[in-house]
From Swiss-Prot:
Annotated protein name in UniProt: S-adenosylmethionine synthase
GO CC, one annotated term: cytoplasm
Source lineage: Bacteria, Bacillati, Actinomycetota, Actinomycetes, Mycobacteriales
Residues holding L-methionine: E59, Q102, D258, K289
Chief location category: cytoplasm
Binding sites annotated in the UniProt record for Mg(2+): D20
Amino acid sequence: MRTSGSRLFTSESVTEGHPDKICDAISDSILDALLAEDPRSRVAVETLVTTGQVHVAGEVTTSAYADIPRIVREKVLEIGYDSSAKGFDGNSCGVNIAIGAQSPDIAQGVDTSHEARVGGTDDEIAKQGAGDQGLMFGYATTDTPELMPLPIALAHRLSRKLTEVRKTGVLPYLRPDGKTQVTIEYDGDRPVRLDTVVISTQHAADIDLDNLLAPDIREKVVDAVLADLDLPSPLDTSDIRLLVNPTGKFVLGGPMGDAGLTGRKIIVDTYGGMARHGGGAFSGKDPSKVDRSAAYAMRWVAKNVVAAGLSERVEVQVAYAIGKAAPVGLFVETFGTEKVDPARIAAAITEVFDLRPGAIIRDLDLLRPIYAPTAAYGHFGRTDIDLPWEHTDRADKLRAAAGL
C-alpha cells in the first residue's frame, strides 16, 4: 500500500537479443577489433538490422584491419540468433558495409586542440581537443551498493537473468529478444517497495503462457533475482504485480519483429531516466568522442562523490566545445543531500579530476578493447565486469579536497 508521501518511479532494460542491442553489440565489437590492433583508431560505426539483413556504416580512420562480416556473424550467433526458426540467423543473414574515413575537418580539432593552435603547447593532453561539442551527465545514489538507481539496476538484473536461463538451458524455449520494466515506490529519496515488474520475452511457438511461461519466469527469473538482492535498506517485495508477456504470445521477435539501430537505447544504457541525459549515444564510438568518454568520466566523478560521503545523491554535468581541450562548463546538483556546500564539492571535483579528453582517456585507460561487454545491460553500475569508471579510487582525495 502506498503512503501519502510516496512516489513511483519506473525504469526499463532490454536483453542482448533486442534489435537495438544487437546493433550496439555489433558496433562495439567492430570498435574493439580495431582498438586491439590500433589503439589510436578513430571509429564511428553505426549498425542497422532488419529481416535477414545487417547494414554497417560510418567513418573509420585506422591502420588496423577488421573482418567486419565475420565479426557481425559471430556476434549475432553469440547472442543466440542461429536459426530461421528464431527469425534471424547469423550464418545466412546478409551483411552490407559502407564505411569511409573520418572527416579531416573533425580530425584537425581532435589532433590539435584550440588551445594548441592559439597558444601553442608541449602538453600532449592539452593538444587533444574534444571530438564534438556537447553535454554529458553522470549520476550516483545510495540506492544500491554499486551506487545506482534501484529501478534500472533491478531491471538490468532481470534482463541478464532472462539471458542466463535461456543460454544455460534452464528455460530452453526462450528466445533472445526480451524486455524488462521495474516500478519502485520511493518514500522521499529511499526505495521502499517493489510495486510492478513487467517481463516480455520472446519464446518458441506453442508455449502455454499461463501454465508454463508465467510460472517459470516468476520462479527462475524474478524470484531468483530478488533472492540475490543485497540492498542498503529493506525493500518490500511481498506484493509484487508481475506482468509476463501482457500482449500474449511473443514468437516473432528480433530483427524480424522490429528493425534495430545503434544508439537507440540511451536511457537503458545510463540511469533509466533517473538522471538527465545529454543525448549522445555510446556504442561504436572510440573514446575521442566525448559523448562516450566524458559520460564515463562523469559517472566516475559522481560515484566517487557519493563514495566519499560528500552527498547521498549527485548529478554532474560537463560540457565541451568541439576542438577545445578544457571543458566549457561543470555543474553539480546534490538534490539537498549534500554533506558539504555544493560549491566545495564542485571545487573538489575540479581539483581532483582532469576532465580534458586526453586526460580522461589516460586516467581511465580507454584505448583498449573493453567496449563490447558494455553494449547490453548498462554501461554503469555493472557488477559482472570490471570497468574503470566504476572504481572509487579518488574518494579519499575528494574528501580531503572538500575539507572532510
